[in-house]
Design a protein with these regions (language model features):
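Nucleotide/phosphate-binding site architecture used for ATP/NTP-dependent chemistry
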Residues: 2-125
Length: 125
C-alpha cells in the first residue's frame, strides 16, 4: 500500500504550490522555541537567548530578487524540476518573502544562535 508521502517522493515537483505541500516540520516540532520570542515572528533585535533551541522569526525579504543559479544535481536528487526556478513564488520564498508561503508552510522562519553557552559556561573552541 502506498501512502501520500510515497507518491510525493516519486513525483517531480513542478511548481511552488506542489513544493509547499512537501513541507515537513517534524524536526522543528521536536525542538523548543525560545519562551521570550514574539508570537508573530517579528523578533529582529539582537539579544541573548537563554532558553530554547530557536527563535521564530519572519525573514527580511529581498525587495527585487533575481534568480542566479542552482545545482541541477541537487534538484534532481530532491526531485525538483528546474522549471521551479522560474516560479516567482519559489524565488520570492527563497529570497525571504515568506508571505507567499502556502499551507502547510509555516508563516515564519526560524533562527538559531551562533554562540554556545551551557549552564553559563561559554564555549568558543
Amino acid at each position: 500500500m502506498s501512502t501520500k508521502s510515497d507518491s510525493l517522493k516519486k513525483k517531480v515537483t513542478e511548481n511552488f504550490s506542489e513544493f509547499s505541500q512537501l513541507s515537513d516540520y517534524s524536526f522543528l516540532n521536536s525542538l523548543k522555541a525560545d519562551p521570550q520570542s514574539t508570537k508573530d515572528g517579528n523578533d529582529h533585535k539582537p539579544r541573548s537567548v537563554y532558553s530554547g533551541h530557536y527563535v521564530p522569526v519572519v525573514p527580511t525579504a529581498i525587495p527585487e530578487p533575481e534568480y542566479i543559479s542552482h545545482s541541477n544535481k541537487l534538484f534532481k536528487e530532491l526531485r525538483l524540476s528546474s522549471d521551479l526556478t522560474k516560479d516567482q513564488n519559489f524565488c520570492r520564498f527563497f529570497s525571504g518573502d515568506i508571505s507567499v508561503a502556502d499551507y502547510p508552510m509555516s508563516p515564519f522562519g526560524w533562527a538559531t544562535g551562533y554562540a554556545l553557552s551551557i549552564y553559563g559556561t561559554e564555549y568558543t573552541q
